Amino acid sequence: IFAPYFKFNLMNKLLIVGTVAFDAIETPFGKTDKILGGAATYIGLASNFFNVDAAVVSVVGEDFPKEYLDLLENKGVNIEGIEIVKGGKTFFWSGKYHNDLNSRDTLVTELNVLADFNPIVPQAYKNSDVVLLGNLHPIVQSGVLNQMSERPKLVVLDTMNFWMDCALPELLDVIKRVDVITINDEEARQLSGEYSLVKAAAKIHTMGPKYVVIKKGEHGALLFHNKDVFFAPALPLEEVFDPTGAGDTFAGGFAGYIAQSENISFSNLKNAIIYGSNLASFCVEKFGTERMETLDKKEVNARLKQFKALTQFEIELEE
């Protein structure tokens, strides 16, 4: 009788903080009405592929369907940290992607209950091994770290240019406190003031993070640690349907792998980046969370083999 409970307690804890939201997406391939979205949603769905005890801290309105919360719970995500605001409306984002899918226009952003979000970390997760701070106001991200009962083994921060524009001092404060930052190439250049990504990463290291992950969308991701650099390719896909959530899925795969393996070394972070890229490659195949909802471990492992083949080569180097 006690075995499952006992096993559950032995799993490493992953605390995920981010948005749980409604999205409406338009791409050259079609458009959706309001569907399930939000960074913490994608991160949570990605964490399901690892042997971790994951919990989401977020906020939704009374208009948020119970079936969406059930979906997360059925995928093994603890949802006690998702606050439901009576009479409130859930955060809503609508965007339209251009033909190349690399750029998009935000059509609507309604913060709704997110405007007053004050995250409360459930007692059982105040000692989480890994904390993933999804893209939110830096003050909210700092507020989460302040609630931890002990320093997590790894803190991963995701942020974006919006916060660099309107909350830079607060952002720099939280960056000081994290081990890993994940941003895209444009954001790395903006944050550092350096065009070369190698120089940008070196500058960001001096702000606090030991590891800098620079996401380059369909061109993969770079991992920097002091003088070490690793490049993870993105799998060339025949069909890219909707890039929404790919970056969050990547972060969820990255953090989930680290939380499961407990090994925080450069060589293991390389594996984590491959796991993140692998999961993100599935996410883009359908609208919203649709593909991540049906994805199984067999498919994930089969594609991991493709990732390995993508970059394996044998060259005999003469001394």
Question: How should each PLM-predicted stretch be described?
Answer:
Residues 1, 142-155:
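Glycosyltransferases and closely related glycan-assembly transferases
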Residues 1-10:
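Short, Lys/Arg-enriched N-terminal segments with co-localized hydrophobic residues
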Residues 11-15:
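Extreme N-terminal starter segment of soluble prokaryotic enzymes
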Residues 22-34, 52-132, 146-152, 301-319:
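Conserved N-terminal subdomain of the carbohydrate kinase-like
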Residues 44-53, 257-262:
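Alpha-helix C-terminal capping segments
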Residues 149-154, 162-231:
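Conserved phosphate/ATP/ADP-binding segment of small-molecule kinases
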